[in-house]
Each structure stands twice: as C-alpha cells, then as structure tokens.
From Swiss-Prot:
Disulfide linkage: C123-C220
Similarity annotation: Belongs to the MnmA/TRMU family.
Keywords in alphabetical order: ATP-binding, Cytoplasm, Disulfide bond, Nucleotide-binding, RNA-binding, Transferase, tRNA processing, tRNA-binding
Protein name, as recorded: tRNA-specific 2-thiouridylase MnmA
One Pfam family this sequence matches: tRNA_Me_trans_C
UniProt lineage: Bacteria, Pseudomonadati, Pseudomonadota, Alphaproteobacteria, Rhodobacterales
Source organism of the structure: Dinoroseobacter shibae (strain DSM 16493 / NCIMB 14021 / DFL 12)
PANTHER family per UniProt: MITOCHONDRIAL TRNA-SPECIFIC 2-THIOURIDYLASE 1, TRNA 5-METHYLAMINOMETHYL-2-THIOURIDYLATE -METHYLTRANSFERASE
Amino acid sequence: MTSATASLTPALNSLGFAKPPSETRVVVAMSGGVDSSVVAAELACEGYDVVGVTLQLYDHGAALAKKGACCAGRDIHDARRVAEEMGFPHYVLDYENTFREAVIDEFADSYLGGATPVPCIRCNERVKFKDLLETARDLEADCMATGHYIQRKMGPAKAELHSAADANRDQSYFLFSTTQEQLDYLRFPLGHLASKAETRALAAKHGLSVADKPDSQDICFVPNGDYASVIEKLRPGAGEPGEIVDMDGTVLGAHRGVIHYTIGQRRGLGIGGLETPLYVVKLDPDARRVIVGPKEALSTRHVPLREINWLGDAPLSSRAEWPIAVKVRSTRPPRDAILRPISDTEATVELLTPEEGVSPGQACVFYDPDGTRIFGGGWIWRGA
C-alpha cells in the first residue's frame, strides 16, 4: 500500500469501524451494575450513538414465592439512572418468559437429573447473545457491547476470544458458547483493564451513581444462595428423601433430596463418625441415591463432552487430537489435556493430570496452552 493510498483509508474507531463514533450505533447490555454502566458511559463520552438496553429477566418474588421481594427492579432503576446521567436513551425489555423457559426451567431439571448446572452460561448463550443481540440488530446497531471481562482480538483470520487481562476477573469460562457470528458483532471494552479498581475509578470519574455498588455474588434468580428452595418451588416434590450409600451399595444414612448435593461435596452429609472422610462421588436421581466414597474416587481423567462450540481456525473434526488446556470448573486454572473429537459437537477430553469433582452439567472450556485464546468448549455429561 502506498502512502497516498494509506492516507485515503479511514482510520478505525475504538470499536473497529471505519467511521466516526457519532455515526456508529452501539447497543450496551446494561445490567444495572458498575461494569456495564462504565462501558455505556465511556462509549457515550467517546461520542458513540449509545442505546442502553436492560432485560427484565426474573422477579425474586416469583422465584421465591414472596410478595414484594423483587430486586430486579432496583437494577433496572440503576441502569435507567445511569442512562439519564450520561444522556443516552434506555429501554427495558420484558424477557421473563424467555428466561424462565431457556434458563430457569433447565436449571431446575438439571438438578433433578443429578447434574450441577451453570445457568449464567445458558443465559449468555440463549438470551443475552441470542435474543438481545437480535434486538440490537433490529435497532440497526453496528455492534453490541457488554461489561464482561473478556477480550475480543482480531487474529490473522477472524475475531478471536481471549482471556481478560485481569485473571481474577476473567469470565471466559462463562462465555465459551459464544459463536463466531456472535463474536463478530460483540465488543468487550473492559477486557483489557488490569483490575476492577480501574473500573470503579472510571465510574467515579463519570460521577456514576453506581460507582460503589457491590458486585453481585449469587445466581441472579437465587438471591440468597438457597437454590434448593427455588427448585422445590418450581418442581414440587423435588426434595424427596432417599439413601446415602457407599460405592458397594451399603446404606450409610438418609438424605433430604438429591437436589441438595453436588459431586465432591463433603460437608452436610450427616454421616460423620467414620474413619475415612467420604465425599459425594455420584448422584443417582432415578434411585434417589447419593453415592459417597473416598477422596481418590473423585479423580477423573476422561471427560465426555457434548454441545461443543468450537472457535478454532480449522474444523474440530479435521484432527484426531488437539493438545489444549481446559477448565472443568470456573475457579480452577487451565490444565493440560488432549481433546479427541467424536463429531463436530461431541468429544472426549483426556486430562493429563486427573481432576477431582468433575461434575455433569458443568462446562469444560478450551484454552490455548501457550497463550490467552479461548477455543470454545462443551458441556460435561455422563457419557453414553
């Protein structure tokens, strides 16, 4: 390219478009928290045509069968207030029915089936990055921005998903199911920040009312962390008692419902006084049994996966083996593994070092063993 040609090429704005920010419309998914509020404020100050959208997803009162217990309304109020403070339009969309069908119902049914689900991933996959993204397109937005801590980088071939600069805030585990088409349209302006302190400093700089708002800790529709109560409200009879047995089938005690237990759990089993500490190693919801065993029984080397979302440059099935790193829990670091495809949507992962407490219903996320790129992931299941 000659210097004359280069001078005629429009410079890309901060969102990657060859036009001024004022001509670039961006829908910001606003939860009412500090992260998405900062994204909206920063983009508005840069001169972008910002449209804030908040989804009404749940009502704590409905989830817990308590009148007047809705906290979602406060988040909507906070998002609307930030939009007013920064001077851009804000809309609230009622997605409660969609959220219940796509996320909450599966959450309850997964526990009934003896799995340990991750509803935040399903929400991103089936609601925020599906229906909300389509709404952004309907609003003729050039892209949609969120407050997630993850990075979108342009690689040699296409947009790539990379871990956040702040490893403590990285949300890549919860975003593995982002498709390539969605990634092309999405932007994550906070992914490069070194710490949450920087986000709060930006909120304070803009004078946002949510600058000191605490981070949410619980699943949004389980505000007090008591997921079993929510499941029993949604699926009456879900807490049927049954037997706690060892790996040989010997009855050791009784439990208060399979939904109260997860793989790897040790506390709260009510079978103390034994010489060897025992952990939940398997759940059998059909027989209403909780199977316990020694810690070594939790070690898993082979992990069956389905519903794989692949973000690699070559097709997943183009190779018999892929050397990768994987996370089988959001709180654990990536571990070296070998990915063996069965089809474009199913595979087996061999962990080079066994992991404890690998549970059906959790995600297994694929990482570049030598870098920050995310290659997608899949859902752990019991296998055929």
